[in-house]
């Protein structure tokens, strides 16, 4: 878990804020069992079947998020990928398109959308290359460097 995650989630629980875990992963038939066990092992609150959704066949979390939002006032989305917030960010080969989408939601970043760094997840690479595992060539390194140094918006 990220440093401070347990303390933050316990703070939420102590203040009557329910936490829903919506994840997409594929680890075979026991994927759900592994995910729930991991949350319990870490001592995270609301580690139960009501609050955990594991998507094995898709990374699209929006349907489940919308279901939760019907019954709850969702105050923040936490994730390591723009796709964790809304599906509209799932654009391949279109860094400029993702930036444009972010610009439309500018007021949500840092308030409703909190992005965690995670260099082990390659989904952000698909926005650049159309593939989460592009070949490690000099040309691809230059493409990645150019995309990584592009600013979504200037700081005012």
Annotate each PLM feature.
Residues 26, 30-156:
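C-terminal cap/substrate-recognition subdomain and adjoining C-terminal extension
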């Amino acid at each position: 878990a990220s440093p401070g995650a347990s303390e933050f989630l316990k703070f939420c629980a102590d203040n009557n804020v329910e936490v829903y875990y919506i994840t997409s992963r594929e680890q075979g038939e026991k994927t759900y069992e592994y995910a729930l066990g991991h949350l319990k092992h870490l001592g995270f609150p609301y580690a139960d079947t009501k609050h955990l959704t594991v998507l094995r066949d898709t990374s699209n979390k929006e349907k489940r998020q919308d279901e939760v939002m019907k019954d709850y006032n969702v105050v923040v989305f936490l994730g390591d990928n723009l796709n964790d917030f809304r599906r509209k960010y799932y654009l391949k080969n279109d860094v400029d398109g993702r930036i444009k989408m972010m610009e439309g939601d500018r007021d949500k970043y840092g308030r409703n959308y909190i992005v965690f760094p995670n260099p082990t997840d390659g989904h952000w690479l698909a926005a650049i290359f159309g593939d989460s595992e592009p070949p490690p060539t000099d040309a691809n390194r230059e493409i990645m460097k150019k995309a990584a140094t592009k600013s979504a918006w200037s700081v005012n």
